[in-house]
Design a protein with these regions (language model features):
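A short helix-coil junction within the Rossmann-fold of NAD(P)-dependent oxidoreductases
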Residues: 15-26
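A hydrophobic alpha-helix adjacent to the NAD(P)-binding/active-site core of NAD(P)-dependent oxidoreductases
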Residues: 1
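C-terminal helical subdomain
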Residues: 74-78, 93-141
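Residue(s) in the substrate-gating loop at a strand-loop-helix junction
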Residues: 34
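Active-site helix of classical SDR
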Residues: 13, 50
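Active-site loop immediately N-terminal to the catalytic Tyr-X3-Lys motif
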Residues: 39-45, 103
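Alpha-helical segment proximal to the catalytic Tyr-Lys
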Residues: 18, 63-66
Length: 149
């Protein structure tokens, strides 16, 4: 997770940045964060930490690129139905199904459509961050242990 969400992001950005800067005005970077980077949940410490990194990296990169015309956005999806949960649950289809049961989660196409919209905003507009959640989800995820006296 750290290799993909942090190192992969940094190395890929470093590789592509010279071309984006050369392109100038209208060039765009859309990083995929997560609402887990803003709102903790039980069992999400490493994942949430890596996605918090994506958010700070994006904001700092935007500052570093001021004057270049390159835009930087951190897109932060919430509950999205994808193979991510199947991998997370070690292939347990029942847990995967339970994660999305009755929730009408975001679909990968929703995220793709949002990225398309971000990329097609006017060149003078930068969307710093954007949270995207299904209407069935909220960020009020406080964990409460009700089994303690």
């Amino acid at each position: 997770m750290i290799d993909t969400n942090i190192k992969g992001l940094v190395y890929t950005t470093r590789l592509l940045l010279p071309r984006l800067i050369a392109h100038g005005r209208g060039a765009s970077i859309v990083n995929l964060g997560s609402v887990a980077g803003n709102y903790p949940y039980p069992g999400g410490n490493v994942y949430g930490g890596t996605k918090a990194f994506v958010g700070q990296f994006s904001l700092n990169l935007r500052n570093d690129l001021i004057g270049t015309g390159v835009r930087v956005t951190n897109l932060e999806p919430g509950l999205c139905e994808s193979e991510f949960s199947l991998v997370r649950f070690g292939g347990d289809q029942a847990k995967y199904d339970a994660t999305y049961a009755g929730a009408e989660p975001i679909q990968p196409q929703d995220i793709a459509d949002t990225i398309f919209w971000i990329m097609n905003t006017p060149a003078h507009v930068n969307i710093n961050s954007l949270e995207l959640m299904p209407v069935s989800q909220t960020w009020a995820g406080f964990a409460i242990d009700r089994n303690r006296g």
